[in-house]
Amino acid sequence: MHGLLLAGLAVALPLGVAGHPARPQTALSPRGIDVNAYRFTSTAKYNEHKTTSQMVQSFAYSKDDDYVATATKLVKSTFPNMTFRTVKDHYIGTNGIGHVHFKQTAHDIDIDNADFNVNIGRDGKVFTFGNSFYQGEMPKTNPMVKRDYSDPVKALHGAIKTLKIPVKPESAKAMPMDEVETFKFEGTSGALSEPKAKLVYIQKDGNLHLTWRVETDVGDNWLLSYVDSKESETVHNVVDYVASADYKVFAFGLNDPTEGQPSMIKDPWNTTGSGSPFTWHGDGKTDYTVTRGNNVAAQDNPSGGSQWENNYRPDSPQLSFVYDYSDQMEPEDYKDFAITQLFYTTNTFHDVLYSLGFTEEAGNFQVNNGNKGGKGNDFAICNAQDGSGTNNANFATPPDGQPGRMRMYTWTTSKPKRDGDLEAGIVIHEYTHGLSNRLCGGPANSNCLNDLEAGGMGEGWGDFYATAIRLKQGDTHDTDYTMGEWAANQKGGIREYPYSTNMQTNPYTYADVKGMREVHGIGTVWATILYDVLWNLIDDHGMGKNVMPKMVDGVPTDGRTLAMKLVLDGMTLMPCNPNFMQARDAIIDADMALTKGANKCSLMKAFAKRGLGSNTKPGKGYTNNFDMPSGC
């Protein structure tokens, strides 16, 4: 779950669509489910480029193999006695790296948290790879032969009872779907879509456990609950997909109403690259006169309900979305302006990310992919002034082919209330959950930021992109930024420290992760490190006036968009459920792929400054190391 919890307020805050907290932090959902208690523990290993180059020197390449075949050969040679399947989400990124993902199996049943990702370079050779394959003893018999497991309906009842999921299963019937031992449940009520169950193994505590993976979408939580196949009230683990024309808007780069005034912007898709070929108001089949198109459907949702398609949207046959806003107005009195702002911010960010490599093949959010790969029919459903909560926001990211869902709330921390739709940093943070969940582990797997440390980096990436985009001309290495300060009406923002390169202003280092038990605190450490990365690259390459990247041979020409590109490319390289060290190495490897390592020393200088030096030790010790690699 992803959202925005804040700190130090004398109000009752919703605790679980995980707000973007800062100080006192909790992992409880609105119903009291402690999702942190059910997180998977990552077993991922990542082989960065230098190590991979040495390891695969003897690997047998064939000039006749395509990148998928080469990746498959590597998996077979690494684990010759294991079975696996190729996940159908492979693609070649804009940096020329091919990405292929594999899922380990046992008796043709998926081991749901056992993954192998292979990244193939432009030369056709293995660039990097990572895996979390299970290497223990395999089950000797196929459980499907004697059906040695409970009925899936019992698993549904068990998940609902144990986790207090607000779904009524009394009349549930399991109806077979196309995949083996996969069912949907008819006759339930309370979920936004029919619950599903699939028989899968999971690895836990060094052993395999046969489970029913029960999927329930109830809005604030979209859960995958791994229920023991025999003891239906035993839930081993849980994954949550939720992370908490003419337009008169605050222009992209203005974070909130304190930074400027609304202005008129005409046909913005003409200046945001090739990400929106149908404009923002069409999907190749239908042209809309409301705030709906190929990338985004933005509407109000005052009831907080699950319906969105027929909800209110501003409508202008002339595509003139010009509405009034004043900081003296209550949010419901400027809902047209708020919906338009949300539509503008999310579409612009979609186009920025598209130019950086979050394309159709990579799993982006679009209805019509235009025969460019990936799965369509999955734009972002964005609810403005959603009535299901306050002082918060969240984004749900199912796998590619299913729409993402953003819920933006009003904030009751000032009079009049404030609307999170008007703070671009919150919107960008939420949308970035969609980016990171689609890229890490591949677009078909949204379970790869479930480990506590990995989930923390998911929060940190959101803050990083929100902060990078709000930088202004004239900012320097000494400029500090906060998160959520305007919406929360809280000086200093909703994080423990502002983002700063000054160690006195923000003293966070890698060692501070030790002892943290909540993703937002961990995320603040990660975003702090990336803020130093950002400014080292800006100091080296400058910062363009426009956040839309200018490219030369696929490489951004300024430091800000180069940092955004390297962080994005790093997500595509790292293994499922990565840790800080693996994410650091993946960013270094992304630079190797993009610039042949031209920025390695500047990157490592930032990492080492915050304790992630070249001799940092793996494991959960979280001991700082400030060493630079040889050659820097």
From Swiss-Prot:
Residues that carry a glycan: N270
Record propeptide residues: 20-244
Binding annotation for Zn(2+): H429, H433
Enzyme's top EC category: hydrolase
EC annotation from Swiss-Prot or TrEMBL: 3.4.24.-
PROSITE patterns linked to this entry: ZINC_PROTEASE
InterPro entries per UniProt: FTP_domain, Fungal_virulence_M36, Peptidase_M36, Peptidase_M4/M1_CTD_sf
Keywords carried by this UniProt record: Glycoprotein, Hydrolase, Metal-binding, Metalloprotease, Protease, Secreted, Signal, Virulence, Zinc, Zymogen
Residue segments, region Disordered: 294-313
Residues of the signal peptide: 1-19
Database matches in CDD domains: M36
Keyword Mitochondrion: no
Localization, UniProt: Secreted
Extent of Polar residues compositional bias: 294-310
First-listed, main subcellular location of the protein, grouped into a coarse class: secreted
Note accompanying the cofactor annotation: Binds 1 zinc ion per subunit.
A GO biological-process term: proteolysis
Its job: Secreted metalloproteinase probably acting as a virulence factor.
Protein name as annotated: Extracellular metalloproteinase 2
Organism: Arthroderma otae (strain ATCC MYA-4605 / CBS 113480) (Microsporum canis)
Gene coding for it: MEP2
